[in-house]
């Protein structure tokens, strides 16, 4: 039987068949192209490719380019001022960033940049388009107008000229000091000159007078000086007075010293007594060897080196004064201890008795009406139909609201920018015209018996406003907001977030409520902007 010979490769060299590398038969064994390689025959190495490389110490490291940085072992985007990362790790522009400014006709509201357009321009599917008017009929020109090559011209004589596109007579020019005012030519004169009876004359300067201590003699002015002053080398200087010293002071050269007698001495440039008088102590002071103590009687005691009043049960020291210790049901008022009374109790003839309950609080509701028109604007365009009601019951205000988009906001996509609807109120609780949901829409009080809107203001409207002491700084409530939930039967990925911001004041407003819609990237696809009914509560304002 003939043995089959294995086929040789096409590039086999029978003279020198040693070109192809042979796998190492010595450990360690490895599988090429799976993280390990043989950097030189018999040497095991890690198989890496860019952006991986080796450091000077032989460790594997990651090479980073512009815009990337390694921080605490993690690869991050190297972002500068005005940029930040959101919860999804996306790079976004900071909300309060001042990195970009916009000038008219560009305007920025919230996170949206818009372009104001005037006549002759329109927005067609996001593209700015020019509306060209119909061409006018051809014009005919008669003298002195002439038309040549599509240009209309007006021949001018020597005395005529065109200035800034206006036809006029060439004016006569005048050089200073001559000037033309209205239809007159006048002469401008400076200090020392005047025009009198149509003639130019010089004005004589007034005579100079001098008051003491200045003195004029012939053509010179001098200064009179008194005691303590003198003029030396043309300068005014003070001359020292002749001072005399009486005992115990005496003057030696330029030094003044004090003479001391018995019982006094000068130590460290200070006058001190050299002997101590004998001290005697009267009651309640007692001298014991070199110590002086205070004898305290009833009601007094020495504590911590201080004389204090000894207090019994029911009394204590508070901020250096004696105060009574009171328990539950008592309070201090007008320097007297009184009973602390709750609801339904009062004091009559020195005794506590129950009182009849007060009549219940009548709720107040402010609203837009049951079926409002498109009453909220974004970028100056009415596009949101907003139903909002504020109901004050007891100390809390309940907010019920729902919103439906119209026009360009009839549906929203995951890339929709955040936007806000703002209600601004004055100090009386009346809706102002400065928000994008303002007093130009239907707004007022709801009667108990029907669904109308009473627009006549009332002093009770203030009760529906956020309490300014409770919300002295802006406060917010964030809640999930489903979109078109009934049509989609509560399907997932059909909700965004709505934030109610309380008293984020601006301008002349006293109270504000801001409905801010955000996190549209939670949507899976384009969705009709028709929110579920949103409910919030906050503490109401005092009457």
Curated annotation (Swiss-Prot):
Domain of life the protein comes from: Viruses
SUPFAM superfamilies: Fibre shaft of virus attachment proteins, Virus attachment protein globular domain
Listed InterPro entries: Adeno_fibre, Adeno_fibre_knob, Adenobir_fibre_prot_rpt/shaft, Adenovirus_pIV-like_att, Attachment_protein_shaft_sf
Main location per the UniProt record: virion
Region annotation (Disordered) ranges: 1-36
Induction text: Expressed in the late phase of the viral replicative cycle.
GO cellular component terms given for this protein: host cell nucleus; viral capsid
Gene3D superfamilies, alphabetized: 6.20.10.20, Adenovirus pIV-related, attachment domain (2.60.90.10), reovirus attachment protein sigma1, domain 1 (2.10.25.20)
Subcellular location: Virion; Host nucleus
Alphabetical UniProt keywords: Capsid protein, Host nucleus, Host-virus interaction, Late protein, Viral attachment to host adhesion receptor, Viral attachment to host cell, Virion, Virus entry into host cell
GO biological process, one term: symbiont entry into host cell
Family, as annotated: Belongs to the adenoviridae fiber family.
General remark: All late proteins expressed from the major late promoter are produced by alternative splicing and alternative polyadenylation of the same gene giving rise to non-overlapping ORFs. A leader sequence is present in the N-terminus of all these mRNAs and is recognized by the viral shutoff protein to provide expression although conventional translation via ribosome scanning from the cap has been shut off in the host cell.
Description of how the protein assembles with itself and partners: Homotrimer. Interacts (via N-terminal tail region) with pentons.
Comment text on domains: The tail region anchors the fiber to penton base capsomers, whereas the shaft, built from several repeated motifs, allows the knob to protrude from the virion.
Task performed by this protein: Forms spikes that protrude from each vertex of the icosahedral capsid. Interacts with host receptor to provide virion initial attachment to target cell. Fiber proteins are shed during virus entry, when virus is still at the cell surface.
Full protein name: Fiber protein
């Amino acid at each position: 039987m003939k043995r089959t010979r294995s086929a040789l490769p096409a590039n086999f060299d029978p003279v020198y068949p040693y070109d192809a590398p042979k796998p190492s038969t010595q450990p360690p064994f490895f599988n090429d192209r799976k993280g390990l390689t043989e950097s030189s025959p018999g040497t095991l190495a890690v198989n890496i490719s860019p952006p991986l490389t080796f450091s000077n110490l032989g460790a594997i490291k990651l090479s980073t380019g512009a815009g990337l940085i390694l921080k605490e072992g993690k690869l991050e985007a190297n972002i500068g001022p005005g940029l930040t990362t959101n919860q999804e790790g996306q790079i976004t522009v900071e909300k309060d960033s001042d990195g970009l400014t916009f000038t008219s006709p560009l305007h920025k509201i919230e996170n949206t940049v818009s372009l104001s357009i005037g006549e002759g321009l329109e927005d067609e599917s996001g593209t700015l388009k020019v509306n060209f008017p119909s061409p006018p009929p051809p014009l005919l020109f008669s003298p002195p107008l002439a038309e040549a090559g599509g240009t209309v011209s007006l021949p001018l004589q020597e005395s005529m000229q065109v200035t800034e596109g206006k036809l006029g007579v060439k004016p006569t020019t005048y050089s200073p000091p001559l000037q033309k005012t209205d239809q007159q030519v006048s002469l401008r004169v400076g200090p020392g000159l005047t025009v009198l009876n149509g003639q130019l004359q010089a004005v004589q300067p007034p005579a100079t007078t001098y008051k003491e201590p200045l003195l004029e003699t012939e053509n010179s002015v001098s200064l009179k000086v008194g005691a303590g002053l003198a003029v030396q080398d043309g300068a005014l200087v003070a001359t020292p007075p002749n001072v005399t010293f009486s005992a115990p002071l005496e003057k030696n050269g330029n030094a003044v010293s004090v003479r001391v007698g018995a019982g006094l001495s000068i130590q460290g440039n200070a006058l001190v007594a050299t002997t101590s008088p004998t001290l005697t102590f009267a009651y309640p002071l007692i001298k014991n060897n070199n110590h002086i103590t205070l004898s305290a009687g009833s009601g007094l005691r020495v504590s911590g080196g201080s004389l204090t009043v000894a207090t019994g049960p029911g009394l204590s020291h508070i901020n250096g004064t004696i105060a009574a210790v009171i328990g539950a049901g008592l309070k201090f008022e007008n320097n007297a201890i009184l009973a602390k009374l709750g609801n339904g109790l009062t004091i009559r003839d020195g005794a506590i008795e129950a009182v009849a309950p007060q009549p219940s609080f009548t709720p107040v509701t402010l609203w837009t009406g049951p079926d409002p028109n498109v009453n909220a604007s974004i970028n100056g365009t009415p596009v949101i139909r907003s139903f909002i009601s504020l109901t004050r019951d007891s100390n809390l205000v309940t907010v019920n609201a729902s919103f439906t988009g119209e026009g360009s906001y009839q549906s929203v996509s995951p890339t929709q920018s955040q936007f806000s609807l703002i209600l601004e109120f004055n100090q009386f609780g009346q809706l102002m015209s400065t928000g994008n949901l303002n007093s130009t829409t239907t707004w007022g009080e709801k009667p108990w018996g029907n669904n109308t809107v009473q627009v006549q203001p009332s002093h009770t409207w203030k009760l529906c406003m956020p309490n300014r002491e409770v919300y002295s700084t802006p406060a917010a409530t964030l809640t999930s907001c489903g979109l078109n939930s009934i049509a989609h039967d509560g399907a997932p990925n059909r909700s965004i977030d709505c934030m109610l911001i309380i008293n984020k004041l601006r301008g002349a407003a006293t109270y504000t409520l801001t409905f801010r819609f955000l996190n549209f990237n939670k949507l899976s696809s384009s969705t009709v902007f028709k929110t579920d009914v949103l409910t919030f509560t906050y503490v109401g304002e005092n009457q």
